[in-house]
Regions:
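Polyanion-engaging groove/track-forming segments
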Residues: 1-455
């Protein structure tokens, strides 16, 4: 599939490209004059199940052909490579273990935090553990940091982090999800080093934002038939600006920082990154140049004045870009929902990209009034799902005195008596509600129910 080369093979796709479509079109174009089975020998590793489904849907749209193997990064450990690696410990079990350790620490140092913050601290520490495992950072590396702190906060922080040391010393025997994923990638890289695959292996759509993913990308890029396809690569960024991204203190928040780190690890220059091939149009190309210039790191912001006036067709570059100043969060969500509704009416594909989960819930609620159910890639929290809400109502019966309001909220829930005789159940519920509203106190007792049932 790929011509021989003496350097790692890395491709990029610019912002504005339909990444799954460009990936599929590029694979088909590169196998146009080859035997049908050659495409089936290609392995494509992607980030998410959503990406895998979209790629399969694009292939299924035709023409008929043998498809490549499409794998999700998190599924790499399901094969022979992960056979000797212990299964991951459930996240809930790990959080409960951490809550016990934090509880013991709070007993020894009660001024560290209140007992009410126990589970919040457990969640925070578990998230930190996941990131440390993913990046390959041990508690010892954090303790060795030279942080000038006269107030003692850093010492207390190190004490807090030290309680998870045992999960790093014995991480391979009872690994969490991130640790197991890193072990799988390490084993896979070692296997490829001694038995390199002859067929093409492609990692597509990954940015290397996680340390484990970066390990996999480096291992694949060094294969004779391996390749990386980077999304949102900035082909307009000058090479002298790329060199200023080496300092993490100044540039770690830049969207191209991880790509710079990857290029340094592979010994590549920006000019070595080839365009996989995608027609993004003149307006999108102009917008990319504008965005690239606006995101220059601090030492190069003077380029705004030097290069800004030379940008062609600013009006075309910003066509379709709207700035909305919302007075309230509700107005913000409604504006987004109205635009998504318009896209649905026009038959367009639209996406809301935001880290704000409250905003997504407000937008979902606004769309619900038009019977539009968006596909949320982050999923729905269990406690907000219909079964979760029902179980929360049931749990309230054990934690507080039963009121008529709580009782009927539970009885009228769609999951309460959801069988074929639900109509009869709702009739009984209505009769009971009318009886209790007329004759019983706000907190009914067993005798009140017996009196109603005897009628």
């Amino acid at each position: 599939m790929f011509d021989p080369t003496d350097r790692p093979r890395v491709f990029g796709l610019p912002l504005g490209a339909d990444f799954p479509r460009a990936l599929v079109d590029g694979l088909i174009a590169r196998h146009k004059d080859q035997l049908p089975e050659t495409l089936a020998r290609v392995t494509v590793i992607v980030n998410t199940q959503r990406m895998a489904r979209r790629i399969r849907d694009l292939f299924d749209a035709g023409p008929p052909m043998l498809l490549p193997r499409i794998q999700v990064i998190t599924d790499l450990g399901q094969g022979a490579v992960g056979a000797g690696i212990p299964p991951a410990v459930p996240a809930l079990r790990r959080r409960l273990e951490l809550s016990q350790l934090i509880g013991t620490l709070l007993e020894k140092e009660p001024d560290l935090a209140s007992r009410a913050a126990l589970f919040d601290l457990s969640d925070s520490l578990a998230a930190l553990m996941d990131e440390m495992h993913g990046e390959g950072v041990s508690p010892g590396a954090i303790s060795a940091l030279d942080v000038s702190d006269q107030s003692g906060h850093w010492e207390r922080t190190k004490t807090f982090i030290s309680i998870i040391k045992k999960y790093f010393d014995g991480a391979t025997s009872e690994p969490d999800v991130e640790t197991r994923q890193r072990l799988v990638v390490s084993a896979l890289a070692a296997h490829w080093a001694s038995n390199p695959p002859k067929d093409p292996v492609i990692v597509a759509g990954s940015t290397g934002s996680r340390g484990t993913t970066m390990m996999l990308m480096q291992a694949v890029a060094k294969l004779s038939q391996g390749a990386l396809i980077l999304p949102g690569f900035d082909f307009d960024l000058p090479e002298d600006v790329w060199t200023k991204l080496d300092d993490p203190l100044l540039s770690e928040d830049h969207p191209q920082y991880r790509y710079r780190k990857l290029m340094l690890a592979l010994g590549l220059r920006p000019a070595d990154i080839s365009n996989w091939g995608a027609d993004i149009g003149l307006d999108v190309a102009a917008r990319n140049r504008l965005v690239s210039l606006s995101l220059r790191p601090a030492p190069f912001t003077d380029a705004w004045l030097a290069e800004g006036p030379a940008l062609p067709d600013i009006a075309g570059a910003t066509q379709g870009v709207t700035l909305v100043h919302a007075r309230h969060p509700r107005d913000e969500a409604l504006a987004v929902a109205l635009r998504l509704r318009q896209a649905a009416e026009d038959g367009q594909t639209a996406a809301l990209i935001t880290p704000d989960r409250m905003l997504t819930r407000r937008v979902t609620a606004a769309l619900d009034q038009w019977n539009i159910a968006p596909d949320d890639s982050a999923g729905q929290p269990l406690h907000l799902s219909p079964p979760g809400r029902f179980l929360r109502h049931v749990a309230q019966l054990f934690s507080q005195k039963m009121s008529a309001e709580l009782l009927f909220t539970l009885l009228k829930h769609p999951l309460c008596h959801s069988g074929g005789s639900r109509n009869q159940h709702l009739l009984f519920t209505r009769d009971l509600e009318l009886y209790l509203r007329r004759t019983a106190p706000p907190y009914p007792k067993e005798s009140d129910f017996r009196a109603w049932a005897s009628q």
